[in-house]
């Protein structure tokens, strides 16, 4: 279980439940299939394993792993529009009258209800790691909407979840621009070969560089003309590489072979053991990586009143 993306949230108070109570709370809102007339459902699933006996909260040392699943019926808008247009034209031709908005909306609703049972089903899962001692929740997603779906559902079943996005004192854009300009990143961080540059004014240009030498004159020229770095590929120590963006989202996480080999050795031959070992090693690595990243970005910013 290696995360590929990272949205970082700070628990502003202690988690109000332990693993056992969290399991019981999550069991009140399990993932389930969409009924014939439902567009979407959302609930919790076991992060590892299947079946009724698989725990909803995987505990490994001081860390917890949870997962939620969204199921939705995919009804293409073009299909609904075509059916609506055909039905409206049929009514107007047969009854020799115009169909106005209120009736059109009613017809549209009827079409959607008729098509729903035949719509395709799409399922997507979101994983999150909870580190109570560090006061962090880490969501394996680059989408704030998907993260908020999970966190709000967790808040619903627990009753409270005092959490906010982790913020830093210096804008990531300023730090990343400085690293590329000076070619001197923070200790243990290494600039790789990919970045996105943007003009600071709203309608300005965007330059995306891939497999480029970011120390080149071409890149430096863009920076001297006022562009800033809004995404930057980086490596940390010899353990992982990632893409950092201006909102402090960590994308495209890739753990180096050394860590993956160690997890494979620690996990033994069973699939569950492999998953547990990789999750544990990942979280221990984050225990060093995330404080280093926050420090490199000027330290954590605590909003006033918290």
Curated annotation (Swiss-Prot):
InterPro entries assigned to the protein according to its UniProt record, in alphabetical order: RdgC (IPR007476)
Localization terms from the record: Cytoplasm, Nucleoid
Key word Cytoplasm present: yes
Alphabetized GO MF terms: double-stranded DNA binding
GO biological process, one term: regulation of DNA recombination
Keyword field: Cytoplasm, DNA recombination
Its job: May be involved in recombination.
Similarity-based family: Belongs to the RdgC family.
Protein name: Recombination-associated protein RdgC
Organism listed in the record: Pseudomonas fluorescens (strain SBW25)
